[in-house]
Curated annotation (Swiss-Prot):
Binding site for Zn(2+) 2: D99, E134, H348
Name of the protein: Succinyl-diaminopimelate desuccinylase
Gene expressing this chain: dapE
Subunit structure: Homodimer.
Natural source organism: Serratia proteamaculans (strain 568)
Catalytic reaction annotation: N-succinyl-(2S,6S)-2,6-diaminopimelate + H2O = (2S,6S)-2,6-diaminopimelate + succinate
Length: 375
C-alpha cells in the first residue's frame, strides 16, 4: 500500500522548480486543496507564483512553505538524478526532499485527513505558498503578506515547514529567527604606481585598522532566546590584478545576524561612526533582509510541543538559530510563528534526502496541531 505523503512528495520532487520557478507544483497542491473545500486565490507577482488558500472562518492557522528549490550542483555527483525521486534503504532522495517539498506533502495530506475527520471545523485553516524563497525572496511571501495586510486579513498562527530538525523529527523547533542586515561598503582611494605611494592613496591600507576594529566589536550579549549578534565579512575586492598598481577603490561586504538586543538602526549608527572616526572616504549601502522575531510560549508553541511529544516521545528544543526564513515576513502580521520540519542534515547538498517515515510522522504532527487549534 502506497503512502499518500510519500506519493505526493515524489510528484512534487519530479518537478524541477528551480527558484523562482514553480513548474506545476502549486497546481498540484491547489487541485488537492480545492477537492476538500478550500477557496484558492492565486497571487502572482513578477516572475513568482504564490497562492493563498483557506477553508472555514474565524481564528486562523496558516501553513506556509515554498515550492522552489536551490540548484542541484553537478548532477553527475548524485547517485540518482536529482529530479527523479528515489527511495533507497528507507530514504527518499531528490532535490527538495527535505527543503521543502516533503513538508508540503505532509501539510496537504494532514489537511485532507483533518477535514475528513472535522468537516465542520470551528476555525479557519489556510495555506500560504510561494515559489520565491530560495533566491531573492522579493516577489514571494513578502508580497502576499503586504496584500493580506492591506485588506486586514487576520492570521493568528502560522506553521512554517522549513527543515528545523537536526537528528530526529521535532528535536528542534524554531520559535523565532535573528534579523539580517548586509552592508556594501566602498572605500575610495587614489590609484597609482606601487613605486610612488606618495602620489596615491591606498584604500586597503586605510581600511585595515577600521576593519580590525569592526570585527572585534561585541555588539550585544544576546539573551535567553537569542545568541549574541554576530558580524561576518563575506566579500572583499580590490586591485586591478597587477602587482604594480595601487588600487583606487576597495569593496567590503559584511553581514550581521542580530538579536532582539540590537536594532538595524543602532548597528548602522555604530558602523558609520567607526568609519567616520577612521576618517575614511567611503560610501555605504545597507540591505535589511529581515527583523528578528520571537514567538513566546502560547497556544501555537504549546500545540507544536504537544504534537512532537505525542508522536516522537521527545521534548523539542525551542531555538532561534540558523538563517532567515519567510517566517520573518509573516510575523509582521502579528501572528505567532513557529517552524517545524524534517531533519536538515542534507539540505542544499548533493543527494539531498529525508527518511520516508519522517514525512509520515511529520504529517501526523501537522494534523494534531490543526486539531488543537482550529477543530
Amino acid at each position: 500500500m502506497t503512502c499518500p505523503v510519500i506519493e505526493l512528495a515524489q510528484q512534487l520532487i519530479k518537478r524541477p522548480s528551480l527558484s523562482p520557478h514553480d513548474e506545476g507544483c502549486q497546481a498540484l497542491m491547489i487541485e488537492r486543496l480545492e477537492a476538500i473545500g478550500f477557496t484558492v486565490e492565486p497571487m502572482p507577482f513578477g516572475d513568482t507564483l504564490n497562492f493563498w488558500a483557506w477553508r472555514g472562518e474565524g481564528q486562523t492557522l496558516a501553513f506556509a512553505g515554498h515550492t522552489d528549490v536551490v540548484p542541484t550542483g553537478d548532477e553527475k555527483r548524485w547517485d540518482n538524478p536529482p529530479f527523479e525521486p528515489t527511495i533507497r534503504d528507507g530514504m527518499l532522495y531528490g532535490r527538495g526532499a527535505a527543503d521543502m517539498k516533503g513538508s508540503l506533502a505532509a501539510m496537504v495530506v494532514a489537511a485532507e485527513r483533518f477535514v475528513a475527520a472535522n468537516p465542520h471545523h470551528q476555525g479557519r485553516l489556510a495555506f500560504l505558498i510561494t515559489s520565491d524563497e530560495e533566491a531573492s525572496a522579493t516577489h514571494g511571501t513578502v508580497k502576499v503578506v503586504e496584500a493580506l495586510m492591506a485588506r486586514n486579513e487576520r492570521l493568528d498562527y502560522c506553521l512554517v515547514g522549513e527543515p528545523s530538525s537536526t537528528e530526529r523529527v521535532g528535536d528542534v523547533v524554531k520559535n523565532g529567527r535573528r534579523g539580517s542586515i548586509t552592508a556594501n561598503l566602498h572605500i575610495h582611494g587614489i590609484q597609482g604606481h606601487v613605486a610612488y605611494p606618495h602620489l596615491a592613496d591606498n584604500p586597503v591600507h586605510r581600511a585595515m585598522p577600521a576593519l580590525n576594529e569592526l570585527v572585534a566589536i561585541e555588539w550585544d550579549r544576546g539573551n535567553e532566546f537569542f545568541p549574541p549578534t554576530s558580524m561576518q565579512i563575506a566579500n572583499v575586492q580590490a586591485g586591478t590584478g597587477s602587482n604594480n598598481v595601487i588600487p583606487g577603490e576597495m569593496f567590503v561586504q559584511f553581514n550581521f545576524r542580530f538579536s532582539t538586543e540590537s536594532t538595524d538602526a543602532t548597528i548602522k549608527q555604530r558602523v558609520e561612526e567607526l568609519l567616520e572616526r577612521h576618517q575614511l572616504n567611503y560610501s555605504i549601502e545597507w540591505r535589511l533582509s529581515g527583523q528578528p522575531f520571537l514567538t513566546a510560549r502560547g497556544a501555537l508553541v504549546d500545540a507544536v510541543v504537544n504534537a512532537v511529544e505525542h508522536y516522537s516521545e521527545l521534548t523539542p528544543q525551542l531555538l532561534t538559530t540558523g538563517g532567515t526564513s519567510d517566517g520573518r515576513f509573516i510575523a509582521q502580521m502579528g501572528a505567532q510563528v513557529v517552524e517545524l520540519g524534517p531533519v536538515n542534515a542534507t539540505i542544499h547538498k548533493v543527494n539531498e534526502c529525508v527518511h520516508a517515515a519522517d514525512l509520515q510522522l511529520l504529517s501526523r504532527m501537522y494534523q494534531r496541531i490543526m486539531e488543537q487549534l482550529v477543530a
